[in-house]
Amino acid sequence: MVMDTNSLRHIFSRVDADKSGSISANELQTSLSNGLGTPLNIRTVQLMVAMFDRDMNGTINFNEFLGLFKYVQDWQTCFRRYDRDNSGSIDLNEFSNALISFGYHLSPQFVNLMMRRFDRNRGSIAFDDFIYACVCLQTLTREFSRYDCRGIGHTVFSFEQFLTSAFAVII
């Protein structure tokens, strides 16, 4: 859904509860739902605000909000593509298919580990946790690639060992 600038300005002003001209992670969290009727995970919201906070002041202004809004829409489209049963969450099989389509060929054991790390004991991953899982995986992949000069998926340790260790630290 493409929205015009005036509509987005209206959304921005509604989310900007304190009328400061910028949106904090807490303000953004209260305005977004994960598709299961609960607010987005604050860690996901903080991650997204940090990604789009170009002036590094801890909040996003309207121009930064435009990028974040498109980013969330793109992730919603992706999420809906893999939520085949329209349950509002992605089960293990749907999550595995999404990761494969992103080019990740991980063992079933590792996909299970990711599922357990991001499902909040629900057995499925809601929209916000899907974003968080995918952005973490992309960030860690980018970091790993800096050291995997030959692009073979191994350095001093395997990719999955690196991810396992990193997930234990960041989650």
Swiss-Prot record:
GO molecular function (one): calcium-dependent protein binding
Pfam families: EF-hand_7
Residues the entry annotates as binding Ca(2+) 3: D83, D85, S87, S89, E94
Alphabetical UniProt keywords: Calcium, Cytoplasm, Metal-binding, Repeat
Any one cellular-component term (Gene Ontology): cytoplasm
Residues binding Ca(2+) 2, per UniProt: D53, D55, N57, T59, E64
Location of the EF-hand domain: 3-38, 40-69, 70-105, 106-140
Subcellular location: Cytoplasm
Binding positions (Ca(2+) 1): D16, D18, S20, S22, E27
UniProt cross-references to InterPro entries, sorted A to Z: EF-hand-dom_pair (IPR011992), EF_Hand_1_Ca_BS (IPR018247), EF_hand_dom (IPR002048), Peflin/Sorcin_CaBP (IPR051426)
Function: Calcium-binding protein.
Protein name, entry field: Sorcin
